[in-house]
């Protein structure tokens, strides 16, 4: 991955910059002297008072704008969940590694041992340097030519997870469990030997020589940045329920609910161009209606009215910078389901089309994604523009398919489009859009 752009620090925010008129940085700005002349500043002048100020603000170390501090003022509920996770780790209730999948991911618990979230550290992603799963290491060693997905920005899966949640909230789809970028540290995470030795050394120094140990900025293991997704209860793999529904067809009203929820999944996956959507990484929750005449097994939850909901998890391999055009096509596996052969409903059109047709909404969505993605130290503005170009093309195709009364299956059969933007020289705040079709096709179009 070519990462030639300047690094963007996560410390930066709008408060770090002053967009007003700058004060003169030298005495001559206030006295009109010529360059190189010596000026005596009177006592108490602004220039002299600034000279006596330290170059670095000593209070900044205690500033709440700590890059490793999890603050979510816009979402108090999510912030409280993170507080529970941090409190549990302090009490010795550590996250538990999930042994499924190809990356390091963890069930995070509260003080009572209840699972409250799923944490996926950046450096333990499928292609991260500290991935505890040996399968990707073996693939990189034995078959480097097929290693990775060249259409994706490597090691940004945690941003993709959070970005999918952002798109879900903006479009009001409500099928992605809330996901944000957080910092967590735990003994059960996969750290390098150096980090563990340093942590033990600092703890030993604090115990033996407290005066020395108190000088350390941090005693424990370094926090890891990653995505934290709220855990959803009562859901099972979609593949489980879809097979069940084939044997025991749903009532008409419940089947309608499933279709509407399925269409929301299609909208999300298509816009973010999810390259890893099988029937085993989206979930279904089905609460069966109360029925005293028949005895059903424990998989069925008895309620008064049938309720069916979907949860789109595992969104870490989305937001590509180009459409797949090498070995694999990374298709949407839901396209083979019978629900994909039904025309988009009027409900999903009314929910999505007004937003997608609004240029201001699309611009706001791009800016929100930019603010999220630029948190990564390896953020590349050029790569981000390519990701947005793909997303714009997906939005264009989706809008056209809904207007034309097409089905999700017909949607995925439309030619891939890229919509690039460029500044208009004569107009400072105007942009021109260039639409192009991808002619190159992957070698395996079905895989």
Swiss-Prot record:
Claim: Mitochondrion is one of the keywords in the record: yes
Membership in a protein family: Belongs to the PI3/PI4-kinase family. Type II PI4K subfamily.
Region called Catalytic loop, residue ranges: 273-281
UniProt membrane topology term: Lipid-anchor
Signal peptide: none
Function: Membrane-bound phosphatidylinositol-4 kinase (PI4-kinase) that catalyzes the phosphorylation of phosphatidylinositol (PI) to phosphatidylinositol 4-phosphate (PI4P), a lipid that plays important roles in endocytosis, Golgi function, protein sorting and membrane trafficking. Besides, phosphorylation of phosphatidylinositol (PI) to phosphatidylinositol 4-phosphate (PI4P) is the first committed step in the generation of phosphatidylinositol 4,5-bisphosphate (PIP2), a precursor of the second messenger inositol 1,4,5-trisphosphate (InsP3).
Reaction it catalyzes: a 1,2-diacyl-sn-glycero-3-phospho-(1D-myo-inositol) + ATP = a 1,2-diacyl-sn-glycero-3-phospho-(1D-myo-inositol 4-phosphate) + ADP + H(+)
GO cellular component terms given for this protein: cytoplasmic vesicle; dendrite; endosome; growing cell tip; membrane; membrane raft; mitochondrion; neuron projection
Gene Ontology molecular functions: 1-phosphatidylinositol 4-kinase activity; AP-3 adaptor complex binding; ATP binding
Region (G-loop): 98-104
Coiled coil residues, start to end: none
Keywords per UniProt: ATP-binding, Cell membrane, Cell projection, Cytoplasmic vesicle, Endosome, Golgi apparatus, Kinase, Lipid metabolism, Lipoprotein, Membrane, Mitochondrion, Nucleotide-binding, Palmitate, Phosphoprotein, Synapse, Synaptosome, Transferase
Region (Important for interaction with membranes): 133-146, 236-244, 327-336
Region Activation loop: start-end pairs: 312-332
UniProt: ATP binding residues: 99-105, 120, 229-232, 314
One GO-annotated biological process of the protein: Golgi organization
Keyword match rRNA processing: no
Region span, Disordered: 1-77
Name this polypeptide is given: Phosphatidylinositol 4-kinase type 2-alpha
Region feature Important for substrate binding, mapped onto this chain: 125-127
Domain PI3K/PI4K catalytic: 92-421
Composition bias, Basic and acidic residues: 48-77
Organism: Danio rerio
Subcellular location: Golgi apparatus, trans-Golgi network membrane; Membrane raft; Endosome; Cytoplasmic vesicle
Lipid attachment points (S-palmitoyl cysteine): 142-143, 145-146
EC number: 2.7.1.67
Domain of life per record: Eukaryota
């Amino acid at each position: 991955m070519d990462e030639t752009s300047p690094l963007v620090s996560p410390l930066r925010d709008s408060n770090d910059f002053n967009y007003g008129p700058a004060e003169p940085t030298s005495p001559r700005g206030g006295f009109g002297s010529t360059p190189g002349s010596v000026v005596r500043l009177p006592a108490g002048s602004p220039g002299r008072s600034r000279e006596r100020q330290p170059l670095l603000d000593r209070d900044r170390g205690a500033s709440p704008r700590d890059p490793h501090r999890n603050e979510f003022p816009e979402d108090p509920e999510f912030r409280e969940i993170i507080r529970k996770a941090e409190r549990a780790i302090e009490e010795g209730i550590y996250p538990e590694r999930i042994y499924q999948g190809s990356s390091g991911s963890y069930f995070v618990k509260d003080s009572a041992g209840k699972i409250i979230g799923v944490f996926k550290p950046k450096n333990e992603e499928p292609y991260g340097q500290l991935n505890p799963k040996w399968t990707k290491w073996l693939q990189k060693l034995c078959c480097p030519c097929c290693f990775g997905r060249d259409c994706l920005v490597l090691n940004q899966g945690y941003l993709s997870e959070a970005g999918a949640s952002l798109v879900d909230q903006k479009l009001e789809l409500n099928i992605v469990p809330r996901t944000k970028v957080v910092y967590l540290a735990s003994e059960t995470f996969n750290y390098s030997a150096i980090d563990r030795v340093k942590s033990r050394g600092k703890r030993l120094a604090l115990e033996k020589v407290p005066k020395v140990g108190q000088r350390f900025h941090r005693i424990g293991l370094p926090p890891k940045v990653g995505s934290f997704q709220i855990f959803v209860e009562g859901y099972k793999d979609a593949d489980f329920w879809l097979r069940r529904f084939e044997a025991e067809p749903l009532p008409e009203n419940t089947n309608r609910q499933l279709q509407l929820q399925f269409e929301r999944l299609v909208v999300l996956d298509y816009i973010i161009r999810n390259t890893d959507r099988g029937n085993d990484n989206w979930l279904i929750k089905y609460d069966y209606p109360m029925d005293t005449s028949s005895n059903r097994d424990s998989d069925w939850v008895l309620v008064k009215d049938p309720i069916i909901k979907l949860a789109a998890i595992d969104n870490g391999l989305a937001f590509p910078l180009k459409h797949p055009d090498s070995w694999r096509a990374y298709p949407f596996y839901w396209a083979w389901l019978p629900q994909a052969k039904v025309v988009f409903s009027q409900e999903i059109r009314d929910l999505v089309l007004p937003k997608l047709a609004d240029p201001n909404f699309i611009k706001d969505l791009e800016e929100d994604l930019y603010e999220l993605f630029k948190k990564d130290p390896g953020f590349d503005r050029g790569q981000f523009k390519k990701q947005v170009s793909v997303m714009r093309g997906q939005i264009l195709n989706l809008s056209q398919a809904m207007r034309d009364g097409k089905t999700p299956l017909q949607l995925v059969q439309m030619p891939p489009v890229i919509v690039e933007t460029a500044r208009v020289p004569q107009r400072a705040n105007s942009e021109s859009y260039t639409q192009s079709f991808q002619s190159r096709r992957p070698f395996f179009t079905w895989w």
